[in-house]
Structure formats: C-alpha cells, structure tokens
Amino acid sequence: MLIRLLLLVICLAGPGVAEEIRIKDLVRFDGVRGNDLLGYGLVVGLNGTGDGLRNAPFTEDIMSNLLERLGVNVTGEQYRPKNVAAVFVTATLPPFARAGAQIDVTVSAMGDAKSLLGGTLVMTPLNGADGQIYAVAQGTIIAGGVSAEGQAARVVQGVPTAGTIPEGARVEREVEFEFARLDRVRLALRSPDFTTAGRIEDRINRELGRGVATMLDAGTVSLDLGRLGPPARVMGRIENLEVVPETVARVVVDQRSGTIVMGEDVRISRVAVAQGGLTLRVEEQPMVVQPNPFSRGETVVVPRTTASIQQRPGTGLAEIPAETSLSRVVAGLNALGVAPNDMIDILKSIHAAGALHAEFIVR
C-alpha cells in the first residue's frame, strides 16, 4: 500500500520578511494552567451496541448503584440489557473557569461495547486529582465513527467507541487562584529559544519601562508587576505586544501516514542522491497433492513459493547544490520521480550524511 504524502511548506509573507506574532501566542503564564478531570458513568439509549454484561461485569455494578440512588431496588434481579455501556469521561477544567461554566468532555467505552453512537451519558461527576468533584457531565454523545454488522460480517469506520459532548459538563467547583495579588509573573515560552526570549524582554521593556522584564533562560521571562497597577490590566497590555519569533529549521516525518512537514529555513549542503527502486516480491501458494487411487497414500499440502525481483529503470544520480532552500529540495526530490515512502528514506539518508541542516524528527 502506498504511503500517502502530505508536504506542507510554511512560507512567509514575502522573501526576507518575518511576521510579528503576539506574545500571548508564544508564551503561557507560568502557574496558570488547566486541570484534568476524570469520572466514570453509564451511556444509555444504544441501539443494541452496548456492553455484554458477561464480559463487562462492572457495567452491571455501575448500573445497579445508579438505580439504587434513584430509589429502584434491584437486589437479586438479573437483567442483561444491550443498550447500556460503561464509560470513562475525561475533561480539562480551564484556568479561571467559574461555577456554571460549561466545558467539553470526551467519552470512551470501558467494556466491549461496539458503538456509542446515539447514546446519552447520564449524570456523571468528574473528579480532580485531589478527589474533589469539580464538574458534572451529561448529554448526547457525538461519536467519531460508525459500525454495522450482520450475522457473518461487520464493517467499522472510524472509532465508534469514543466520542465527545460539546459543553457537556457544568463546572460546580472553582479552582482558587488569586491572580490579582501577584506582584511577579513568569512567562514560559511554548518553544524555548534564547533569541525569542530576548526579543520578548526587549519589547516589554520598551513598552512598560526598563527593568519590568528579565530573561531568566531560553524558556522563561520574569515580569515585575508591583509598580504597574492591577496585574490583570498589565497582562492584558503585555499579551497583545508583538515580536518576531526566531524560527528553528526542523523536518518532521510521520512514517505511519507518510506525512513530511518542513519549515522554510531548512537548508542542505551540496549532496548527490540516487534512488534504487528495487522491489522484492515473495508469494506463497500451497498446493494440495492427492494420492493415486487405491494406493493407501495420504493427501498432503505441498508448499509452493514464487519469488521475483523487479528493478525500476534507474533515475541516475541527482545533484542538489549547496545551500539549497526548501523549494529546491522539493524540486530535486520530485526530479528523481520517487514514491512518497522512498522520499522519506531519502530525507533520512541526507540527514545521516550530515547534509541536512535541521532538526530531524521521526514519529
């Protein structure tokens, strides 16, 4: 199967022109973060695609506990519905979220349910790492796939055993954080870089005065807010200031999907590339051999192997000049007429030869 190739070229507005980015898009406020929430509950209303209670006994326990809380006595009763599934529910409580705010949740099957499509999550408390309940989730699930089956076949597209509920949880408890009392805040860069951190320091000091911002390292800029007024107002001014971030030459390769992403600053030294195009094919076709009549012989299966080697016409040796930009790299690889999966191997080889001057990430 051919590996699909998606080559994304990140181009700037014009040659030699760098774009200014807001500081809020380059950093996060140290200590201001979301909190993960987790709960487990029941999804009801499934069209016969729920848990098989023999294989997922915890579903019956969860259902019994829920019905007992609602005043329904189920002690000693045996019931095996197919429209119920036990699920894990996860969400992230954003910073500064107030009671009554609604947040998105993700629902994932715990047992052997075939699909959560069309199901409804019933009231499920969501706990934080401290064991306290911070939100309650409930709503109709939007599944990410679909499945259909008959007596002898089943077709599945996507992942029908997981889904989301947009704004499916309501915040019940707030995380206390007194931002207004802070007199010092640290900015944490999303992509640490000394040059970018220095530019952020210079830009803030030009706007608010010398000594307000101090670069501590490649990933941290400290702010002294004590003499500038209310911290929220000051941070509102700072986060909308713009700087030019330093870009890093980077190539990211995803071997599973055949995706290659390269930034504009990728350069390579002078190098020659040849691509082989050798294909080896081995097939096994077992053959049944019957004995002669009345020979008392046995029927046996004889292995039969067919092997072949195919060599595509050579594309020759292609030379890529020194200090070649991204566009020339793409043109050079396309000139070889290589397949997408071969292009990934060529990039690996160029990097191994020391000619690709960029961070090379393989996933």
UniProtKB/Swiss-Prot annotation:
It is found in: Periplasm; Bacterial flagellum basal body. The keyword Signal applies. Keywords: Bacterial flagellum, Periplasm, Signal. InterPro entries: Flag_FlgI. Pfam families: FlgI. GO terms for biological process: bacterial-type flagellum-dependent cell motility. GO terms for molecular function: structural molecule activity. Belongs to the FlgI family. PANTHER family: FLAGELLAR P-RING PERIPLASMIC PROTEIN FLGI (PTHR30381), FLAGELLAR P-RING PROTEIN (PTHR30381:SF0). This is Flagellar P-ring protein 2.
